[in-house]
Curated annotation (Swiss-Prot):
The gene is ytvB. Keywords: Cell membrane, Membrane, Transmembrane, Transmembrane helix. It comes from the Bacteria. One of its GO terms (cellular component) is plasma membrane. Pfam families: DUF4257. The keyword DNA damage does not apply. It is found in: Cell membrane. This is Uncharacterized protein YtvB. It is a multi-pass membrane protein. InterPro entries: DUF4257. The chain crosses the membrane at residues 4-23, 39-61, 65-84.
């Protein structure tokens, strides 16, 4: 039951921080809209990314106290995209492959 409470708290805090990060990045709260080619989710995208990042970080870190939980949720929710990219980077390193950035840098330019 303790883990469920931690995940719920991480969802709430991460979602709020994701929305605050969206406002800081864009300068305003953008509503979802549809264009001819795609659906732009606006602030919902950053809300979902912040929530997901904070859940993943809390589940992987397993905080001992409430203060650690809140701090981890705030940090991961605010920088949600960077946290998710770091999880992808760690997964690539653990699978024995090189990260995509290093593969791109080692290629020689065509002549």
């Amino acid at each position: 039951m303790k883990m469920l409470h931690q995940v719920l708290i991480a969802c709430v805090i991460g979602g709020i921080m994701g929305i605050l990060g969206h406002v800081k990045k864009r300068g305003r709260l953008e509503k979802p809209r549809m264009t001819k080619r795609f659906i732009y989710l606006g602030f919902l995208e950053d809300w979902f990314i912040g929530m997901t990042a904070s859940i993943l970080l809390v589940l992987s870190a397993d905080p001992d106290s409430g203060i650690q939980l809140v701090i981890l949720s705030i940090i991961s929710g605010y920088g949600g995209e960077a946290v998710l990219r770091s999880f992808d980077f760690v997964r690539e390193l653990n699978s024995g492959g090189e990260p995509a950035e290093s593969k791109r840098q080692t290629k020689t330019p065509p002549e």
